A protein has these predicted regions:
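Basic nucleic-acid-binding interfaces
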Residues: 1-86
Length: 86
């Protein structure tokens, strides 16, 4: 479960051997969610509106890196770290 970014208490991961469509996982204060690459929560229980907004903002800024990591994951290659929100 490689961590690809951490910001404001939000941990972002991508798991190997995942299924389409492309997505990533976020955890915030013990709550978890699965997000599409646009940063929209597909399933999960993250209730903080602020955390959800920050994940969307981060995903929008780093869409290309998320796509690159998804392709690397499918090939079994190492995932790159992605800059956190500042």
């Amino acid at each position: 479960m490689p961590i690809i970014s951490v910001f404001f208490g939000i941990v972002i991961r991508m798991f190997y051997k995942e299924h389409e469509p492309a997505h990533f996982h976020a955890e915030y204060q013990g709550q978890q969610g699965k997000f599409d690459l646009d940063g929209e929560m597909i399933v999960g229980n993250i209730r903080s509106g602020t955390a959800l907004r920050l994940v969307r903002e981060w995903a929008t800024l780093h869409r290309r890196e998320l796509e690159d990591n998804w392709e690397s994951m499918k090939r079994g290659h190492p995932l790159g770290r992605i800059e956190p929100l500042q």
